[in-house]
Amino acid sequence: MSFRADRIYLEFLRLTRRLSNQQIMMLLAVVVGVLAGLGTYLFEMLLHGIKSGLIRWFPVDSAHILFLIYPAVGIILATLFVKYIVRDNISEGVTRVLYAMSRRNSRIARHNCWTSIVGGATTIGFGGSVGPEAPIVLTGAAIGSNIGRLARLNYKHTTLLLCCGAGAALAAIFKAPITGVVFVLEILMLDITAGSVIPLLIASITATTMAFMLRGFDPILAVTLAPADAFELWQIPLFILLGVLCGLMAWYFTSMNSRVGAFFKSIDKQYKKWLWGGAILGILIFVFPPLYGEGYEGFTSLMHGNAQELFNNSLFYRFRDIDWVIILFVIATMFFKVIAMSTTNTAGGVGGTFAPSLFVGAFTGASLALVCNTLFGWEVSIVSFTLVGMAGVMSGVMNAPLTSIFLIAELSNGYGLFIPLMITACISFAVDYYLDPDSIYTKQLRQKGELLTHDKDQSVFVFLKLEELMETDFLRIKENMTLGDIVHIISTARRNIFPVIDNFGRLIGVVQLDDLREDMFKHEKYGHPISDYMIPPPDKIIEHEAILSVMEKFEDKHAWMLPVVDKQGRYLGFISKSRILNAYREQLVKIQQ
């Protein structure tokens, strides 16, 4: 494999020897865009092939018992695929990309170029209530990362290609090139320059062109705004209200996802997760069929004014023409979508939260429009409120108002709703950020100190690892030693601080050389226990603790050296502030190269 990689690299050098670095990156961006577009096409074909073969023959006027079975089968197949073939974590695609950027030098395993396609399509095709975007983004990012690896690019350029792949994949699946670029700039990229934007644009345009060639020009959500759907000034209070509702729904989305995840993590056996996940998901889809799969058909029906189609294959099919039943059904589906999505992901399925956030947003906007039209007799456009609601919830869930605004603007073939999109997306973002400042992608990474942000100073610290900076060449002193016992020990020491440990290796204090100097040559004091000279450390660092947290302890305690212990309190080594700062400077140079 290494020999093959060397040959590819030499051929790459031969072909590009007369090109500048910028031209090489533009050329590689085209390659990434083409491959990301092909990957998206394969994903779509596999997904719709599975889904169509399983449910297209169901009668629309009654529920089908297979809705109880399909989701469990999909979760089991996806879990077995991941456990026995992939043997790696391919869930939470966007989070995995962020983790690779912060902890793996933007290196993503080669298998991610195809395994997310198989796992995601299997999960969603069998009814898993998740979105295809996260697996496809991980696929595109893996393509970019591995092309960067083959070309032996540095960290900065590899990261740029990774982002090109992620943005290109998203652009291809929605046929929305601007959205792909904005998504990367808003969520993924740390260092934004003119030189990085051009390859992003090229990759997104190339992938979108591939999508047009392979799948036609029809958008994923075929909707055209009619004159009756145009924005009017009197609707501004309603869009403000919609923004608040979307912010609350975004907070519910994120918090419920965490709660369901915690529930499944408390289950010790995988087969129990299958049983619980299959049962919960099967029952929800049996009662609310719009929850099957990514859910695009559901909010497409709403945007076309065909809310009755939501009742196809439902137990409530006979009540589809009753207005208040429609409203209750839409609201219930909206809330249960989050539970269905979280259950799918945490029970073993492979998928993302992108499409579910659009689904919940669409149903939130449609609910408000239906209530206004039914209860108050107003003529509010369900199409407009459905589209704007999609942007609202997505803005809050992902903490990405610009991505949500441009996505809906591109999907609706124009910017007629730009003002309400901006109003609702910004208010939703503000409400959700007030309730929970982390997005659904960043919550776990921030808690672990592994999140890259647009604050470059903080982000550089994320790259540093405690175990790589810890120093271990300190002479240890046992707690039962006397001054006489350690005089000969410290005479050969290169350090001026010594950890004191008990018989179990636990750190109980430290001894500083300066505190011993006065008595070192007084033989009458050699019998004094070392505890007479021992002091407690200013603070302790726990193994694997984030460097940002370590620096905060240094600042709080005004210290320059702190001991590192494991979770049981056993001594491991010391970490110095000066070594962290030196590593920080080296990492900053590496990023900027």
Can you annotate each of these PLM segments?
Residues 477-494, 500-501, 520-523, 540-560, ...:
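The conserved cystathionine-beta-synthase
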Residues 473-477, 532, 537-540:
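Structural signal for short hydrophobic segments within the conserved structured cores
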Residues 526-531:
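PAS and related sensory helical modules
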Residues 1-468, 472-473, 477-498, 502-508, ...:
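Alpha-helical transmembrane segments and immediately membrane-proximal extracytoplasmic
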